[in-house]
Amino acid sequence: MSAKIVVEVAYALPEKQYLQRVTLQEGATVEEAIRASGLLELRTDIDLAKNKVGIYSRPTKLADVVHDGDRVEIYRPLIADPKELRRQRAEKSANK
């Protein structure tokens, strides 16, 4: 019989944070943890084909195996490109 592990799945919005604790079979993947959390049903804006995921702020793939105590994070897409914002600020400063 395979051992059980407990992981947390997190998704944060500016106004609300979701943190679900799930129990899985040892050897479960990031995707299985996310699906078991129920967040895909709660938040229709999460698309695993588009949203990046990670474990403790380190980018990972949906097929990667989770370990007991991991925190799986679902990241929202960037609203603005940081490089573009820096370029715009630099241009604005140069024009002063």
Curated annotation (Swiss-Prot):
Please name the SUPFAM superfamilies in this protein's record.
MoaD/ThiS
Q: Which family does this protein fall into? A: Belongs to the UPF0125 (RnfH) family.
Protein name in the entry = Protein RnfH
Instruction: Give the residue spans that cross the bilayer.
Output: none
Q: So which domain of life are we looking at?
A: Bacteria
List the lineage, top down. Bacteria, Pseudomonadati, Pseudomonadota, Gammaproteobacteria, Enterobacterales
**Gene name for this UniProt entry:** rnfH
